[in-house]
């Protein structure tokens, strides 16, 4: 049982989608309690087709966070392109709290000028009713001139601005995900790739004839640690995503797996079986100095760091079934963290250190759950039968994970409050082991 669990977890826990498949979002959970907002289509001041539907990108970003419920275009009472064109009453009557308006103009040489405003509907309605000249209802206003190739990135930037102004929290829409793509029958079936968080702008970092597993981002977002079988055994490498340089970190006898970076970027928590059963170790990336953390007769696996860099959480079956435990690196004191559900595994800690996200087993089905670190209360976020490999956005608002959708492995998103769920179906092959990057700017 434990070996089956271990290899299912450390082996190839995850799933999902191709960059093109990210275009197709299937909404599987509602956001009725989210905040109503509207992103009006940006006015196109140029010839030919609009180069990028910025409003659609922003709308999708905000919807995926689970905190906002964008108004459908067909329900919009008007399509203003500036705050001065907004008739606030009909927006307010639909409960819309804020409206994003903007325009795109071609300025030549493949560059574009983009203007946008974030407008508070209630404040705007009060200002117009009282006849004042104040524009205090404009929460943010920006203008930028950018190359056409950067237009989608700028749309994510708008999403970050809107998200932060309305929630007080930093947006995570300009982040990336790393994953392993598998295309059976290809010359190099296994590929390590990165893309924008929504699957666009995909880039291949490594191609291999042998399995690749468990990518993990360094805290500065410049490197990936991962497991490779290119030499007919599991080994852990670190690769720079910009210059492609890589170094071998761990190549001991037996299993070398499940690397996770420490918050300071100097160490990796890893799993080794060089002395028998798989145990947790910490290795210094520069010196390769190795420190053993656990030493038991059962399998300890899937380490993850607490934000303080002094504590690890990990999966262990020492209590009879897989559960989450913590260990203090200085004292060695270990304690069990999870008690609900039939089993719990594959945990990571949210950036604020207040929650754990994990795979929980409920009535034989594997689902994504979040547990409060202080109270121990658990919230099951998904209702599928085989959800795996959750990875949390750097602002803690969203989780990317693997699931089965219509009989195929697919990548999925769920907000950390469970209010929004979406599946990104794959059209060919499969994607495993997604990992969400830290903030990149």
From Swiss-Prot:
GO terms under cellular component: periplasmic space
Secretion signal, residue range per the UniProt entry: 1-21
Gene3D superfamilies in UniProt: TolB, C-terminal domain, TolB, N-terminal domain
One of the GO biological process terms: protein import
Record keyword Cell division present: yes
Protein's name according to its UniProt entry: Tol-Pal system protein TolB
Sequence similarity: Belongs to the TolB family.
SUPFAM superfamilies on file: TolB, N-terminal domain, Tricorn protease N-terminal domain
Source organism, top-level taxon: Bacteria
Entry annotated with the keyword Transferase: no
Functional description taken from the UniProt entry: Part of the Tol-Pal system, which plays a role in outer membrane invagination during cell division and is important for maintaining outer membrane integrity.
Pfam families, sorted: PD40, TolB_N
Entry keywords, A to Z: Cell cycle, Cell division, Periplasm, Signal
Cellular compartment(s): Periplasm
Subunit structure: The Tol-Pal system is composed of five core proteins: the inner membrane proteins TolA, TolQ and TolR, the periplasmic protein TolB and the outer membrane protein Pal. They form a network linking the inner and outer membranes and the peptidoglycan layer.
């Amino acid at each position: 049982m434990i070996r089956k669990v271990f290899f299912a977890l450390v082996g190839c826990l995850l799933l999902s989608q191709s960059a093109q498949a990210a275009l197709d979002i299937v909404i599987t959970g509602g956001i009725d309690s989210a905040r109503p907002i509207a992103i009006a289509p940006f006015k196109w001041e140029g010839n030919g087709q609009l180069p990028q539907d910025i409003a659609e990108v922003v709308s999708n970003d905000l919807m995926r966070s689970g905190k906002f419920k964008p108004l459908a275009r067909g329900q919009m009472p008007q399509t203003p392109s500036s705050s001065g064109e907004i008739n606030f009453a009909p927006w307010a009557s639909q409960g819309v709290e804020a409206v994003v308006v903007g325009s795109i103009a071609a300025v030549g040489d493949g560059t574009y000028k983009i203007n946008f405003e974030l407008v508070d509907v209630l404040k705007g309605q009060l200002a117009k009713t009282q006849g004042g000249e104040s524009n205090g209802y404009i929460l943010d206003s920006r203008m930028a001139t950018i190359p056409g190739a950067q237009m989608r990135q700028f749309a994510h930037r708008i999403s970050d601005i809107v998200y932060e102004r309305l929630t007080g929290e930093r947006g995570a829409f300009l982040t990336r995900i790393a994953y392993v793509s598998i295309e059976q029958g290809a010359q190099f079936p296994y590929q390590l790739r990165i893309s924008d968080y929504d699957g666009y702008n995909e880039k291949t970092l490594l191609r291999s004839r042998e399995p690749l597993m468990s990518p993990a981002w360094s805290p500065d977002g410049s490197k990936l640690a991962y497991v490779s079988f290119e030499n007919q055994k599991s080994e852990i490498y670190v690769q720079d995503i910009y210059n492609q340089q890589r170094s071998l970190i761990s190549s001991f006898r037996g299993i070398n797996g499940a690397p996770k970076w420490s918050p300071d970027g100097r160490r990796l928590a890893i799993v080794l079986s060089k002395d028998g059963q798989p145990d947790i170790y910490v290795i210094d990336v520069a010196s390769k100095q190795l420190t053993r953390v656990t030493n038991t007769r059962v399998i300890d696996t899937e380490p993850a760091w607490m934000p303080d860099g002094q504590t690890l959480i990990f999966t262990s079956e020492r209590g009879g079934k897989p559960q989450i435990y913590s260990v203090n690196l200085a004292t060695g004191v270990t304690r069990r963290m999870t008690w609900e559900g039939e089993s719990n595994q594959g945990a990571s800690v949210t950036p604020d250190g207040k929650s754990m996200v994990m795979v929980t087993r409920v009535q034989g089905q594997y689902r994504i759950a979040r547990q409060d670190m202080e109270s121990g209360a658990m919230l099951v976020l998904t209702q599928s039968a085989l959800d795996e490999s959750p990875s949390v956005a750097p602002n803690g608002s969203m989780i990317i994970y693997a699931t089965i959708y219509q009989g195929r492995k697919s990548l999925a998103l769920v907000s950390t409050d469970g209010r929004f769920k979406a599946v990104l179906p794959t059209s060919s092959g499969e994607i495993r082991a997604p990992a969400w990057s830290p903030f990149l700017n």
